[in-house]
Amino acid sequence: MAGNKKINRREEILQALAEMLESNEGASRITTAKLAKQVGVSEAALYRHFPSKARMFEGLIEFIEESLMSRINRIFDEEKDTLNRIRLVMQLLLAFAERNPGLTRILSGHALMFENERLRDRINQLFERIETSLRQILRERKLREGKSFPVDENILAAQLLGQVEGSLNRFVRSDFKYLPTANFDEYWALLSAQIK
């Protein structure tokens, strides 16, 4: 029973941190004192569940990474058409950001500006994994469909991910007014016409 309470408290702390990142407080540095107040516990209680604030952010980053990479792997398993795979991965990233504005502050790096450099490195590694997945999709086109792209797959993967990152940054910069998935079908029609 005590184990469940500890797990629930850890989840409660992470949920509160994500909510604070989504609110106006997320636009500035979040302190453990503010977080403890939000959760309704002492700062010491926070540290019974997490050894540092960096570990709290790592908990959210792990959730982001697991959520995105497991779904990207599912797209690999279920979809075989290259352009559909790319579209689905891009939609996944944009929809995840839209549903989780607080976590998008982490993905954009905004919430990590004054935090441990290790956290920014973790986000960079996540984006590198996503870019590698996009590159793999692009390279498999030649094997699956006997076609290649008009530009190098490395450049194309970087461009696709850059488009997503730009949408995420715009979402954060606008205080979540410009939804990342807005007009995606029109945007995709323009993008896919260029890469066919």
Curated annotation (Swiss-Prot):
It is found in: Cytoplasm, Nucleoid. Residues 110-139 form a coiled coil. GO terms for biological process: cell division; negative regulation of division septum assembly; regulation of DNA-templated transcription. It comes from the Bacteria. One of its GO terms (molecular function) is transcription cis-regulatory region binding. Keywords: Cell cycle, Cell division, Coiled coil, Cytoplasm, DNA-binding. Residues 7-68 form the HTH tetR-type domain. One of its GO terms (cellular component) is cytoplasm. InterPro entries: Homeodomain-like_sf (IPR009057), HTH-type_TetR-like_transc_reg (IPR050109), HTH_TetR (IPR001647), NO_SlmA (IPR023769), SlmA-like_C (IPR054580), Tet_transcr_reg_TetR-rel_C_sf (IPR036271). Required for nucleoid occlusion (NO) phenomenon, which prevents Z-ring formation and cell division over the nucleoid. Acts as a DNA-associated cell division inhibitor that binds simultaneously chromosomal DNA and FtsZ, and disrupts the assembly of FtsZ polymers. SlmA-DNA-binding sequences (SBS) are dispersed on non-Ter regions of the chromosome, preventing FtsZ polymerization at these regions. Homodimer. Interacts with FtsZ. Belongs to the nucleoid occlusion factor SlmA family. This is Nucleoid occlusion factor SlmA. It comes from Vibrio cholerae serotype O1 (strain ATCC 39315 / El Tor Inaba N16961).
